[in-house]
């Protein structure tokens, strides 16, 4: 689909006309038309809900007790001005925004797994659905290329969220519950580490058995 108001419309249309074949079936076209009737309203709602969730979760990134270490979304990105320059124009039936996709990054894979399993939303690799979807992105997309993905800045401990049309306060409540589960897992691990350090000191070992590499690389997200 080409936007006739864009400067390269005529050039692109000429190129596409030379290779275009109409392969749209009648029932597909009917479904597309039905889905398009409230597209702008749905998109506006998803934009608004996503912004609300990101803004609500953002303070946790700087909280040392939180399992959340980073949050990725164009609205809060250092390069947000580049995105704002290309936002769709506001109209009576549409409020521009930054889309329904954002990414959470956690301390490590285990804590990301605890959050993922506790988050009461649909789980899946798609995006743009009418229901909120959650996906352990690197675990599913780059399962056999994790080292390469890490070199490109994609950490194993990220969870991608595609926001749907649910009530935004209900969604935020679900995120709070899941984050609380992960925070408890983090606190329990710290407590266990202190106990092990204490036991080790008393037995003369002089060091804790809990290390940064303590089996976390073996943790996998549950299916």
What are the residue ranges of the model-derived segments?
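Active-site C-terminal subdomain of aminotransferase-like
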Residues: 1-101, 105-139
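PLP-dependent enzyme catalytic core of the Aspartate aminotransferase-like
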Residues: 133-223
